[in-house]
């Protein structure tokens, strides 16, 4: 990379797994990148539901869930890192006395792009989203308040410095700017194909040797 070139920044983009990516955690996955910098990348898989519903999750943390529209929504497997920890991707709620959410390994969910939020531990993401790790967002949802659209995961996906760039060079992923309708309005089983459609592609067109970064 020339010295005066800006580093790649795929924050608020989708990573779409290529057929040659056989890692069980990421095969046919769509990852929403919450942060990408020279230090690494952090994202959430948005199309791999677990067997746990949001109502089941709220029961586990001793909260009721009054939002009937959310009760049967699945909790997603966001990635192989910290799989017992919850992450809530949601529409931005505006400033309050927020703090920064921290991840571990690879990119940290803190620093650049993290601003004050309505919740105690939140990362602000360009594109109108936030990612919250503190229980207060669940408490808000339990009362019928909180963000209107949410996606909840257990675990997240993380890449160390230069790791994602190497995987892109190996044609493990396609990349495209994120579309919120894929995250919040598209049935889970259609999200992979809908993300591909943003590039004008269909899954039958892909081969392990082709990629686009």
From Swiss-Prot:
Positions of the UniProt region annotated as Disordered: 93-120
Pfam family, one: DUF179
Family statement drawn from the similarity comment of this UniProt entry: Belongs to the UPF0301 (AlgH) family.
Stored InterPro entries: AlgH-like
Protein name, UniProt field: UPF0301 protein Aave_0907
GO cellular component, one term: cytosol
Organism per entry: Paracidovorax citrulli (strain AAC00-1) (Acidovorax citrulli)
HAMAP family noted in UniProt: UPF0301
């Amino acid at each position: 990379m020339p010295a005066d070139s800006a580093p790649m920044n795929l924050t608020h983009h989708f990573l779409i797994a290529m057929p040659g990516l056989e890692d069980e955690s990421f095969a046919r996955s769509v990852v929403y990148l919450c942060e990408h910098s020279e230090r690494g990348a952090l994202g959430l898989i948005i199309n791999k539901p677990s067997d746990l519903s949001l109502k089941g999750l709220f029961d586990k943390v001793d909260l009721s869930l009054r939002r009937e529209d959310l009760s049967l929504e699945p909790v997603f497997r966001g990635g192989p890192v910290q799989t017992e920890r919850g992450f809530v991707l949601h529409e931005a709620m505006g400033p309050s006395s927020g703090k920064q959410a921290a991840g571990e390994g690879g990119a940290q969910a803190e620093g650049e792009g993290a601003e004050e939020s309505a919740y105690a531990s939140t990362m602000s993401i360009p594109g109108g989203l936030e990612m919250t790790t503190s229980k207060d967002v669940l408490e808000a949802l339990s009362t019928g308040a909180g963000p209107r659209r949410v996606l909840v995961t257990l675990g997240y996906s993380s890449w160390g410095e230069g790791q994602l760039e190497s995987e892109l060079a190996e044609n493990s992923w396609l990349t495209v700017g994120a579309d919120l309708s894929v995250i919040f309005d598209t049935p889970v089983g259609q999200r992979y194909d809908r993300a591909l459609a943003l590039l004008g592609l269909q899954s039958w067109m892909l081969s392990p040797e082709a990629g686009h970064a």
